[in-house]
């Protein structure tokens, strides 16, 4: 897990002016995350360790269930900040919006999902996927594009020698696979381990290890919000960085116990198959 989190060490602000927080600011940040996963451990650690509270920030966290939905929340004003794939900011910019969305901090530098199959494959190799159907997620999203890149690198092309299924919404990929669709699916934790525990799947590969480093998940907000809340966003990133330092200097059991309150009803992270 810690290898996937080292990207947070490189958190940085984009090159734009930071304005002071407006008068009467209550310190609340409404944050919509693309999915709820231990992949974003620094965020939950910062919440549970009280780092945001120390900075006078209150996080109101909601789960978008996909980058498209998280971006919709930001654009509609239902969320102040979105945590999602950077491609969504590009899509919005290309629409020609005047108050477009900007990335102000990077959280991860790899795909954090895992390829899940229907049988255990201790010696899994991407060269053995010819003729298989893989549930990719939403076309144009980071999970789908990253997996497509891996498959293309191994000579697979949709409709020629493999089926890349883009018809399933991001937050329904796990249940759809569990119900019998596809031979493989890409899933984040804790969903991947939940399927393993239910006997409905087996983790066979780390997508992030196979794809290499890419700017995968980032914090973003509208240009106007960033201009009006520069100091608050800097304090927000400071908390994320501080939580990252905690994770990098404590053992897995300690980190898992810090994360546990953010995953009520879920088997402890240290018992998950990919931990």
What are these regions (language model features)?
Residues 1-28:
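Short, low-complexity disordered leader/linker segments with a strong preference
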Residues 227-275:
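Secondary-structure end/capping motifs
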Residues 191-192, 209-211, 225-226:
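Short, catalytically relevant binding-site loops at active-site mouths
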Residues 132-137, 179-182, 224-227, 242-248:
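Second-shell loop/turn segments in exported
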Residues 27-169, 176, 183-189, 200, ...:
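Short, glycine-/small- and polar/acidic-enriched structural segments
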Residues 114-116, 218-221, 225-226:
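Short glycine- and hydrophobic/aromatic-rich loop-to-beta-strand nucleating segment
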Residues 24, 217, 236:
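Glycine-rich, positively charged active-site loop/lid region within alpha/beta enzyme cores that binds
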Residues 195:
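Short helix- or helix-capping micro-motifs
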């Amino acid at each position: 897990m810690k290898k996937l989190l080292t990207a947070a060490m490189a958190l940085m602000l984009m090159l734009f002016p930071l304005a002071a927080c407006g008068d009467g600011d209550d310190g609340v940040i409404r944050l919509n995350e693309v999915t709820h996963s231990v992949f974003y451990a620094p965020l939950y650690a910062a919440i549970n360790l009280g780092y945001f509270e120390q900075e006078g920030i209150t996080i109101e966290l909601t789960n978008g269930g996909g980058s498209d939905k998280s971006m919709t929340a930001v654009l509609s004003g239902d969320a102040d900040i979105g945590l999602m794939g950077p491609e969504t900011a590009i899509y919005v910019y290309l629409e020609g919006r005047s108050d477009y969305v900007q990335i102000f901090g990077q959280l991860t530098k790899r795909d954090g999902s895992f390829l899940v199959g229907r049988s255990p494959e201790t010696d899994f190799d991407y060269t053995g996927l010819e003729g298989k159907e893989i549930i990719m997620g939403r076309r144009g999203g980071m999970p789908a594009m990253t997996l497509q890149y891996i498959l293309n690198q191994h000579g697979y092309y949709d409709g020629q020698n493999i089926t890349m299924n883009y018809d399933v919404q991001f937050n329904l990929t796990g249940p759809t696979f569990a119900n019998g669709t596809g031979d493989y699916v890409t899933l984040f934790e804790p969903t991947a381990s939940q399927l393993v525990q239910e006997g409905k799947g087996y983790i066979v590969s780390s997508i992030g290890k196979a794809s290499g480093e890419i700017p995968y998940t980032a914090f973003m907000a509208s240009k106007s919000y960033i201009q009006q809340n520069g100091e608050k966003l800097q304090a927000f990133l400071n908390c994320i960085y501080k939580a990252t330092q905690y994770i990098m200097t404590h053992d897995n059991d300690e980190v898992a116990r810090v994360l546990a309150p953010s995953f009520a009803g879920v088997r402890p992270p240290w018992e998950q198959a990919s931990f």
